[in-house]
Amino acid sequence: MDISVQEQMATVDNFDALTNGEIEIVGRLVDASNASIYCKVGGVSAIYKPIAGERPLWDFPDGHLAWREVAAYKVSQALGFNCVPLTILRDGPFGDGSFQLWIEDAEEVGERYLEKSPELRKLALLDAIINNTDRKIGHLLYKNGEVLGCDHGVTFHQDYKLRTVLWQFADLQLNPEEISALQKMQDPEEFLEGLLTQSEIGALKVRIANLLQEGKFPLPPTDWPAIPWPPF
């Protein structure tokens, strides 16, 4: 029986490997804006983003991008979306950082990011919840008909900063499953404490409340660019 990408990435073995496995550095992703290191961890392929390799961002002065990467994964899991690869925080050769399961043989995105698929819809809603300011085409991972999202370092800002290429769902009504998922997110402090500031957690709760009140996907902003640049 075939196992989905989500099921593969959520196995106990993968979690144990990323958490406790020996780290072998393979190489660096040279196109990344912050240090992103491809490695083997307990035999599992992963991307290691050390905090020491993060460039300072004037509009994200608090916390670390690695913490936000982990927080995005935890929110995806809490919602039941399972649309972010397994991501943990641990010590590495260059200090603490995020370790995210590498999705082998990801496919070319092409024009598929324009589709109104259920998988992209989950990611669009996740982005609205975590206030993703950098959902680019290249941050979508396609494999075997499934779609995952990566690169969530610039998320959870307390000010509204949503920028994404997934605006095809704008102003659509939330379905009952999405509303139920949002209602389960009433106490995010339980799994986000230590990763985000209290102000950021408070803003997250406000965004969730607003989505439930409006019952719709948000519209693109009119007072700043709605799409990140470059879009890929």
What are these regions (language model features)?
Residues 1-232:
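Phosphate/dinucleotide-binding and metal-coordinating scaffold of catalytic cores
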